[in-house]
């Protein structure tokens, strides 16, 4: 398996299909910038888009409805207006601010989705918008 959920470097979250990188493995990627880290899917199986279009009630019970994701989701309207961009850009913007290069796993729905996602690199996000 690519992800060993029992290792000291990866810890399972509420949903055991999700993991986060911590400790030595995080430090390794931060110090070795020629390596790419592939974090979990940036759009979280549509979690943020569902929240943006249908509200918090619609994502109750969703596997990505963690407190940190809900904090970010509650700010989507404010941030999409601030940066004049799409929800996709706000979500992918998180990865542009990591301390090491990230390649989010992103599944576009078509050519327009690819263009929208690529626009993320044209936006200068304020790290404070993602500090919570």
Language-model features: where?
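Beta/alpha (TIM)-barrel catalytic core signal, keyed to glycine-rich beta->alpha loops juxtaposed to Asp/Glu
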Residues: 1-131
């Amino acid at each position: 398996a690519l992800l060993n959920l029992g290792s000291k470097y990866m810890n399972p979250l509420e949903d055991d299909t999700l993991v986060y990188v911590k400790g030595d493995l995080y430090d390794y990627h931060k110090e070795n910038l020629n390596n790419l880290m592939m974090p979990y899917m940036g759009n979280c199986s549509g979690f943020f888009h569902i929240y943006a279009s249908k509200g918090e009630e619609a994502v109750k019970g969703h596997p990505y409805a963690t407190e940190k994701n809900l904090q970010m989701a509650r700010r989507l309207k404010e941030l999409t207006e601030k940066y004049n961009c799409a929800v996709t850009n706000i979500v992918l913007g998180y990865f542009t601010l990591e301390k090491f290069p990230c390649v989010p796993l992103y599944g576009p729905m078509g050519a327009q989705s690819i263009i929208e996602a690529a626009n993320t690199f044209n936006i200068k996000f304020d790290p404070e918008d993602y500090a919570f």
